[in-house]
């Protein structure tokens, strides 16, 4: 009887872990980090160990963990979206939709550049306001954040929009209407810093 119980217990030892959702290189890296689960009982997995391994990887947006009895684990990962590029102390990073900074490489050069200082999580909230507006985030080439809390954006046509610190959504929609109005097609600077006051400059 003891040998039967012991045999069943051994069958529940994890001997296979599958990681999907990222590049082969990143999947393999996470797989190596999860090596500590091999030969652990599938019923007694330390969830904090799993969370620590997965949450320290800034490229991960979310994940699902599935136990496949008797001895396998499957980790399905959703990669974070890369929103923009920023420079911190001379080092370039991507800003992810998960509110984290991700090591930069030379892919995704069409992302907007962020100048100034802003927390990654605050930047994600900023993009959500843009999504609510008529503006297309993909048409933005540069974003400037100032210590006052105000920001400017430049679109891919080179037009600079100086936004109000307050009523950001209203300012964005107003800028969109001006840009798409034939009368103002030559305006290169749209100054909306003061509420209910518009200054257009052709230069």
Which residues make up each language-model segment?
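Charged, solvent-exposed interaction patches on well-folded alpha/beta domains
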Residues: 1-203
């Amino acid at each position: 009887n003891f040998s039967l119980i012991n045999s069943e217990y051994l069958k529940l030892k994890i001997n296979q872990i599958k990681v999907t959702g990222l590049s082969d290189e990143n999947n393999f890296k996470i797989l190596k980090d999860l090596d500590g689960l091999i030969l652990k009982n599938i019923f007694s997995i330390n969830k904090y160990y799993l969370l620590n391994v997965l949450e320290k990887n800034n490229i991960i947006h979310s994940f699902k963990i599935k136990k496949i009895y008797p001895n396998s684990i499957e980790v399905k990962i959703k990669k974070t979206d890369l929103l923009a590029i920023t420079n911190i102390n001379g080092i370039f990073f991507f800003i992810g939709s998960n509110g984290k900074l991700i090591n930069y490489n030379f892919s995704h050069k069409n992302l907007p550049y962020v100048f100034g200082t802003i927390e990654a999580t605050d930047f994600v909230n900023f993009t959500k306001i843009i999504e609510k507006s008529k503006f297309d985030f993909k048409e933005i080439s540069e974003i400037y954040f100032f210590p006052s809390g105000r920001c400017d954006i430049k679109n891919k046509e080179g037009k600079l929009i100086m936004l109000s610190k307050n009523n950001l959504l209203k300012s964005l929609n107003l800028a969109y209407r001006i840009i798409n109005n034939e009368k103002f097609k030559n305006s290169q600077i749209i100054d909306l810093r003061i509420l209910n006051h518009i200054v257009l400059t052709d230069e």
